[in-house]
Design a protein with these regions (language model features):
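N-terminal periplasmic accessory domains that precede
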Residues: 35-43, 60-63, 89-95, 115-137, ...
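Extracytoplasmic beta-strand/coil segments of soluble accessory domains associated
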Residues: 41-80
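Short acidic/polar hinge/loop motifs at secondary-structure boundaries
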Residues: 79-107, 124
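Short strand-turn segments of transmembrane beta-barrel domains in outer membranes
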Residues: 101-106, 111, 121, 127-154, ...
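Periplasmic-side early beta-strands and strand-to-turn transitions of outer-membrane beta-barrels
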Residues: 131, 155-234
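Conserved C-terminal beta-signal and adjacent last beta-strands/turns
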Residues: 153, 159, 164, 189, ...
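Outer-membrane beta-barrel signature, preferentially recognizing the C-terminal barrel domain
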Residues: 227-229, 233-242, 274, 351-413, ...
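Gram-negative outer-membrane beta-barrel transporters
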Residues: 321-328, 409-411, 430-512
Length: 575
């Protein structure tokens, strides 16, 4: 069915409630994977997700289209929690159980859902639970990963609660082969701990909820297979708190977070330790009426540590108008670093069973981060915000065949890029003008006793202008953007259990800005096989999965090989 705003809470941008986002198909193996995997691992089954990862469990740079990772935003119950220090959020530290089947808002529609995004958004939320229960999930892999996830829920004194503890640890050692290079990857171990706690209830006609999200992680990186193998160490600790009150037409959300990060660099004769902090406070008020939704928010971002010290305030006003059943518009204004930024978005829908068509246009901004403005040395307080202008078309069909087609066309101006400055230091500059085109096709169909799900994304980019003497990159494509990604899933019900076969394809990617062939990552494809079995009462479930059954060569960064054939066992107990 068409899913228009399937969420248990009000989003920051209610226009998303009118956007058709499509629905992810989850196999039996996928359902258990959400209790064990991180969001970055789980989202690889969606071709709209662009992943850059050194090794399993490493820091992830990701996006949902667009021209850079900073342009795609991550929301938590409508609050933009993407770091305003770095501009991104490491999805390897996000539990997959915070993803719903409609979490991804693709294209320029995602820009309407966040404070400063322009292409794609991911909305995280903890699904509500009824009754009382406890689940324990355990995951084991052949490369040394061990995962434990404990989830309990219930109520006391008319207060609902959910508690989640997730622990992951891995030696992350495996053999590799890239071309004629062979060896064993070592020194990339990692571990993380996540604690989520929710309380919710009602006081008269007022609904309230409070959420605490704590994460602590440590990751090692031994560098590429061409490096000497010095091990760098990253420590990260973050606590997030969100409180919500909702009564009638009014809603208030308060969000606060504090992150501490330490990076130890040993890839030279010197051992360097860099420690930094980042904080965010957001107060968000929403007034909901039949023809409009009004939003007022106040954001405070702070950064401290060895490389930058800064505090920036960002008040924002947003008005969502619904003049008719077919039309929706969003108007936004924000003040950031003594500048006022405007953006606008419009959506038109036409529905005639079994078809749904939507057209949308929008103009957005991507604000410079605190690192880009204040990093020492190299920060540029004068760097301008990126601007984007885009259009989107969506077509959906619901019947025996479920089909979703989307096409996004965007022009980006003043894209920010770190480049050598006049003093020799690397500094952020408004470097590019870029055109991007992203086309997505998703198809689902049940044939006999098999369920088939196919999704593919085609991306095209072209650098139109560059603010430097480096004119040889004009006309070139952006780096690390595969022209084509595709995922095909078949699920077969067996007399006992369920079998899943899933194939992946990632096209050629450029890693050099001049698109020289010496830096190209060739197209890669691999296949996963999974068998799942559960009791009739669903009291237990287990999945045995073989990833990359053919041992295909894979790498998301050049000379950082991913594992070959890997075995995984996931077990879930429910009481």
């Amino acid at each position: 069915m068409f899913l228009w705003g399937q969420s248990d809470t009000l989003w920051t941008a209610d226009i998303i409630g009118e956007v058709s986002t499509g629905s992810e198909y989850r196999t039996s193996a996928d359902s258990l994977a959400t209790d064990v995997e991180s969001a970055s691992d789980y989202l690889q089954k969606d071709s709209r997700f662009n992943l850059k990862q050194y090794t399993p469990g490493s820091v992830v740079a990701s996006s949902f289209g667009g021209a850079s990772s900073e342009q795609s935003r991550v929301l938590w119950d409508g609050i933009d929690i993407s770091s305003m220090a770095t501009g991104v959020l490491d999805l390897s530290l996000v539990p997959a159980m915070m993803l719903s089947t409609t979490s991804i808002v693709d294209g320029i529609n995602g820009g309407a859902s966040s404070n400063m995004g322009s292409m794609g958004a991911l909305n995280l939320n903890l699904s509500p639970k009824s009754g009382r229960g406890t689940t324990t999930a355990i995951g084991l892999t052949s490369i040394g990963e061990r995962t434990l996830n404990a989830h309990s829920w219930g109520s006391f004194s008319n207060i609902r609660y959910q508690s989640i503890v997730r622990f992951t640890s891995s030696e992350n050692e495996y053999d590799y082969r890239i071309g004629t290079l062979e060896g064993r990857m070592v020194g990339n171990g990692y571990g993380d701990l996540t604690y989520l706690q929710r309380f919710s209830g009602s006081m008269g006609k007022t609904y309230w909820s409070s959420d605490l999200w704590y994460t602590q992680s440590e990751k090692n990186n031994s560098g590429s297979i061409l490096s000497p193998g010095y091990i760098n160490h990253l420590e990260d600790e973050v606590v997030r708190f969100k409180y919500k009150l909702k009564r009638g037409h009014n809603e208030l959300k308060l969000f606060a977070s504090q992150e501490w990060q330490a990076y130890t660099d040993t890839m030279s004769s010197w051992t360097l330790r860099d420690t930094n902090t980042f904080g965010q406070f957001t107060a968000h008020y929403t007034r909901t009426e039949k023809l409009y939704h009004a939003h007022l928010s106040l954001n405070r971002y702070t950064a401290g540590g060895m490389n930058r010290t800064a505090t920036v305030w960002m008040p924002q006003v947003q008005l969502n108008l619904k003049p008719s059943q077919a039309w929706n518009t969003v108007l936004k204004a924000a003040q950031y670093h003594n500048h006022v930024y405007w953006s606008a978005y419009a959506l038109y829908s036409h529905s005639k069973t079994p078809w749904l068509q939507q057209w949308s246009v929008g103009s957005y901004y991507r604000l410079p981060t605190l690192n880009e403005m204040y990093w020492n040395p190299g920060g540029n307080v004068g760097v301008s915000a990126e601007r984007s202008y885009g259009a989107k078309y969506s077509l959906e069909h619901e019947g025996k065949w479920t089909i979703r087609f989307t096409s996004d066309q965007l022009y980006y101006d003043q894209m920010i890029q770190w480049a050598p400055g006049s003093d020799g230091n690397w500094t952020p500059q408004n470097y590019y003008s870029v055109y991007t085109s992203t086309t997505y096709l998703g198809v689902q169909r049940k044939i006999w006793q098999q369920k088939h799900a196919f999704n593919t994304t085609h991306q095209y980019s072209r650098i139109l202008d560059v603010a430097s003497n480096n004119s040889n990159i004009i006309g070139k494509q952006l780096i690390y953007r595969p022209a084509l990604q595709a995922v095909y899933t078949i699920e077969q019900e067996l007399p006992v259990g369920t079998l899943m076969l899933r194939g992946y394809y990632t096209g050629l990617r450029h890693t050099l800005r001049d698109n020289a062939r010496t830096g190209d990552l060739p197209a890669q494809s691999w296949v996963d096989l999974a068998y799942s079995l559960s009791s009739k009462s669903k009291r237990w479930q287990w999945v045995f999965r073989i990833e990359n059954i053919t041992g295909a060569q894979r790498q998301f960064y050049q000379y950082y090989p991913m594992p070959g054939r890997t075995y995984l066992l996931n077990i879930k107990l429910h009481s």
